């Protein structure tokens, strides 16, 4: 059922993800100018380890974390067995690079990235994605982020983005708030080149429908490796232009308070719903690295309601709902009319 990966699969993916960590850190340091990443290497008692890099109190980033890990073990956590029961009973290996950036300026969005690879006996798969969480809405920023990742997916297969975009909307959703964490991006998991592209749990959702409307996956290991490589390389051109455009925008305590309020939603998702956080904690991962995704400051306010017609209201009513960001002309017209396009 499962095609065997190449003999050097672990070393090859490890090197890809280490290189991605290096490139991202270099690009972020260059644009921040003031902040520098501090690296801390760590070893996991059960096998493997990683290197965590954190930048704090830069000119752009209040906190930025870019982590690499390579871990292995004998007993799979329940979060994996429930998704892939055929992997049970095998020793496992997992490697990944993850990143979360929390800028100071509320006009610069928070952003998350994660690319990973997993093996357990004959079972292997790739997963990953990137998603953007603005605090103040600008459609042009959203479009740049989505377009770069769409192009990266289409270098491998024209159908992938049709599934990965709604899958991202589905995954980064706060069920207890009935809202999206941000404006999405791409998300994929359990990709082994067989069966349907969509491997999530919502068979009635948009991602599942998109997957059913196209042919089953016929990608091999090398194709999926290239997908991770292309999408990883798409990150800096998807995000740095937003920083360049927004970093000089002035803001007041009002914008800062709203940013901290919306960061609270980020915390809620990561601690309640995120599978990566759950996997890390279930496998005795390094807690400091796992919780690196949390912002240094956040706030909660009972019964908050944004003023009607304000940028804050546009964010909560439109930019926390799945949209056709690239092609919806009515959305484009609305954003132009309300000065939230560019």
From Swiss-Prot:
Domain of life, source organism: Bacteria
PROSITE patterns (UniProt xref): COPROGEN_OXIDASE
Any one GO biological process: chlorophyll biosynthetic process
EC number annotated for this UniProt entry: 1.3.3.3
Listed GO CC annotations: cytoplasm
Main location per the UniProt record: cytoplasm
Annotated stretches, region: Important for dimerization: 266-301
Pathway: Porphyrin-containing compound metabolism; protoporphyrin-IX biosynthesis; protoporphyrinogen-IX from coproporphyrinogen-III (O2 route): step 1/1
Cofactors required: a divalent metal cation
Keyword Transmembrane: no
InterPro entries: Coprogen_oxidase_aer (IPR001260), Coprogen_oxidase_aer_sf (IPR036406), Coprogen_oxidase_CS (IPR018375)
Residues annotated for substrate binding in this entry: 98, 114-116
Record-marked site positions (Important for dimerization): 176
Residues given in the record as a divalent metal cation binding sites: 102, 112, 146, 176
Location in or out of the cell: Cytoplasm
Reactions catalysed, as given in the entry: coproporphyrinogen III + O2 + 2 H(+) = protoporphyrinogen IX + 2 CO2 + 2 H2O
Keywords: Chlorophyll biosynthesis, Cytoplasm, Heme biosynthesis, Metal-binding, Oxidoreductase, Porphyrin biosynthesis
Gene3D superfamilies the record matches: Coproporphyrinogen III oxidase, aerobic
Catalytic site positions: 112 (proton donor)
Family according to the record: Belongs to the aerobic coproporphyrinogen-III oxidase family.
Oligomeric form and interacting partners: Homodimer.
Family annotation (PANTHER family): COPROPORPHYRINOGEN III OXIDASE, MITOCHONDRIAL, OXYGEN-DEPENDENT COPROPORPHYRINOGEN-III OXIDASE, MITOCHONDRIAL
The protein's role, per its UniProt record: Involved in the heme and chlorophyll biosynthesis. Catalyzes the aerobic oxidative decarboxylation of propionate groups of rings A and B of coproporphyrinogen-III to yield the vinyl groups in protoporphyrinogen-IX.
Full protein name: Oxygen-dependent coproporphyrinogen-III oxidase
Organism, as annotated: Prochlorococcus marinus (strain MIT 9215)
């Amino acid at each position: 059922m499962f095609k065997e990966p190449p003999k050097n699969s672990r070393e090859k993916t490890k090197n890809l993800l280490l290189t991605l960590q290096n490139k991202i850190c270099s690009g972020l340091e260059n644009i921040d100018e003031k902040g520098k990443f501090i690296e801390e290497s760590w070893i996991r008692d059960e096998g493997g380890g990683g290197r965590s890099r954190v930048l704090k109190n830069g000119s752009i980033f209040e906190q930025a974390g870019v982590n690499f890990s390579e871990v292995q073990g004998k007993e799979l956590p329940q979060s994996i067995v429930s998704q892939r029961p055929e992997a049970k009973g095998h020793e496992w290996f997992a490697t990944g690079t993850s990143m979360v950036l929390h800028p100071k300026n509320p006009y610069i969005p928070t952003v998350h990235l994660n690319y990973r690879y997993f093996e357990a006996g004959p079972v292997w798969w790739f997963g990953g994605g990137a998603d953007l969480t603005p605090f103040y809405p600008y459609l042009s920023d959203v479009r740049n982020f989505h377009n770069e990742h769409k192009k990266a997916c289409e270098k491998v297969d024209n159908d992938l983005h049709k599934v990965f975009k709604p899958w991202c909307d589905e995954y980064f959703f706060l069920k207890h708030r009935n809202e999206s964490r941000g404006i999405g991006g791409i998300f994929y998991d359990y990709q082994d080149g067989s069966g349907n592209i969509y491997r999530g749990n919502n068979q009635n959702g948009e991602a599942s429908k998109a997957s059913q409307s196209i042919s089953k996956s016929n990608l091999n290991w090398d194709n999926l490796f290239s997908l991770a490589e292309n999408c990883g390389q798409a990150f800096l051109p998807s995000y740095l232009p937003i920083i360049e455009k927004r970093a000089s925008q002035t803001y007041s305590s009002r914008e800062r308070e709203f940013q901290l309020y919306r960061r609270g939603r980020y915390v809620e998702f990561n601690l309640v719903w995120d599978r990566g956080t759950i996997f890390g904690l279930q496998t005795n991962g390094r807690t400091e690295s796992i919780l690196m995704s949390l912002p240094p400051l956040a706030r909660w306010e009972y019964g908050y309601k944004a003023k009607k017609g304000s940028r804050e209201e546009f964010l909560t009513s439109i930019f926390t709902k799945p949209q056709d960001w690239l092609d919806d002309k009515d959305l484009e017209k609305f954003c132009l009319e309300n000065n939230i396009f560019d």
